[in-house]
Amino acid sequence: MPPILILLTLLLPLRAGAEEIIGGHEVKPHSRPYMAFIKSVDIEGKKKYCGGFLVQDDFVLTAAHCRNRSMTVTLGAHNIKAKEETQQIIPVAKAIPHPAFNRKHGTNDIMLLKLESKAKRTKAVRPLKLPRPNARVKPGDVCSVAGWGKTSINATKASARLREAQLIIQEDEECKKLWYTYSKTTQICAGDPKKVQAPYEGESGGPLVCDNLAYGVVSYGINRTITPGVFTKVVHFLPWISTNMKLL
């Protein structure tokens, strides 16, 4: 089995884009049909990229710190630099960050993107199911994160193909030791504190998938040598997600 390597957007994610993913392995093309590649432009006119995932035909879930201008979502992609017949590129009609999102502390880091048109469901494009309100993950559970980005710390270019890595759910105390703002109520701690392999600038907004359900959203970390990282806990925000998808 290949080693579990860095895949997350976790180094300074609230001030950076999602250009880098370290390690992991390339997945079978279109085997993660819920994955979304989000393009946008920041206030300085620079292109920014984030991950996300389809939760309904016209809604994508991502991280609130990914909010920018001129946002578009690409669904059904494996190679984001190729013009694949499976790809569906849809502009974002409205970005809905959580009203209590705190950029400085990285709390309530979750956002819904209302698409201008509904995605067409195909083998390469399908929503990812959300967990039930009483569902929980526990320390030791193995989950996965996927995204596009660099395959090594020294790489100068990002991988165009979708990659994935496995992470282990950690005790909340592991993240609380690193970040005083960490909340076990609204966040999940995942990685492997025994390995210098996880947090690094990469795919913000992508899903933490456990048992084929979206339990978390990639939020933040500390640097390229410290793990674990922090994920927004989807279960806590289910009422907010449901309410906003019904309103629009």
Swiss-Prot record:
Record's keyword terms, sorted: Cytolysis, Disulfide bond, Glycoprotein, Hydrolase, Lysosome, Protease, Serine protease, Signal, Zymogen
Give the residues annotated as active site.
Answer: 65 (charge relay system), 109 (charge relay system), 204 (charge relay system)
One molecular function GO term is: serine-type endopeptidase activity
Q: Which GO terms describe its biological process?
A: killing of cells of another organism; proteolysis
**In which compartments does the protein localize?**
Cytolytic granule
As given in the record, the signal peptide range reads: 1-18
Which PROSITE patterns is this protein grouped with?
TRYPSIN_DOM, TRYPSIN_HIS, TRYPSIN_SER
> What's the EC number here?
3.4.21.-
Which residues are connected by disulfide bridges in this protein?
50-66, 143-210, 175-189
Give the glycosylated residues: 68, 154, 223
What are the residue boundaries of the Peptidase S1 domain, all occurrences included? Answer: 21-246
What family, per the record? Belongs to the peptidase S1 family. Granzyme subfamily.
What is the protein name given in its UniProt record?
A: Granzyme G
